[in-house]
Swiss-Prot record:
HAMAP family found in the cross-reference section: NusB
InterPro entries: NusB-like_sf, NusB_fam, NusB_RsmB_TIM44
PANTHER family linked: ANTITERMINATION NUSB DOMAIN-CONTAINING PROTEIN, N UTILIZATION SUBSTANCE PROTEIN B-RELATED
A molecular function GO annotation: RNA binding
Superkingdom of source: Bacteria
One Gene Ontology term, aspect cellular component: cytosol
Pfam families, A to Z: NusB (PF01029)
Protein name according to UniProt: Transcription antitermination protein NusB
Length: 154
């Protein structure tokens, strides 16, 4: 962790949801301004929610999504009804975060990853954007975790 970034409060009370919200802000900054993750982490350390987030999860998710953005975009491209470049930057970031969790973090149940993406879209996305996000994430879950997805559909 860079020396300039402050560390959040002890683990009690820290939230993965707040971590995902911060990652959304970070990925958005990265997509819009081509900023490095270390710069993004330093900037987000001043966010009022930073102390309420699970720092380790935030850092891991931010770095994982940033490093995998090309892979995630390629995966999304085959499932969208438009070009990835035509997505709003917010919905693009949300889809990348949830897709990363679905593809790379099997410790998170697929329904949780989808629900968290939908909740971010409700908070930060456009009108009815959450419905679009839900549909795309459902397709990713079916591809990335077919057994878990089928069990969940029964």
């Amino acid at each position: 962790m860079p020396a300039e970034a402050k560390k959040p409060a002890p683990k009690a009370g820290r939230s993965r949801r707040k971590s995902r919200e911060l990652v959304l802000k970070g990925i958005y900054l990265g997509l819009m301004n081509q900023k490095d993750t270390s710069v993004i982490i330093r900037e987000l350390a001043d966010d009022p929610d930073f102390d309420r987030a699970d720092y380790e999860y935030f850092r891991q998710l931010l770095e994982g999504v940033a490093e995998s953005i090309d892979e995630l975009d390629a995966r999304l491209a085959g499932l969208l009804d438009r070009q990835v470049s035509e997505l709003s930057p917010i919905e693009h970031a949300i889809l990348c975060i949830a897709a990363y969790e679905l593809i790379h973090d099997v410790t998170i149940p697929y329904r949780v990853a989808i629900n968290e993406g939908v909740e971010l879209a409700k908070l930060y996305g456009g009108t009815d954007g959450h419905k679009y996000v839900n549909g795309v994430l459902d397709k990713i879950a079916a591809e990335a975790r077919p057994d878990e997805f089928q069990r969940g559909r029964r």
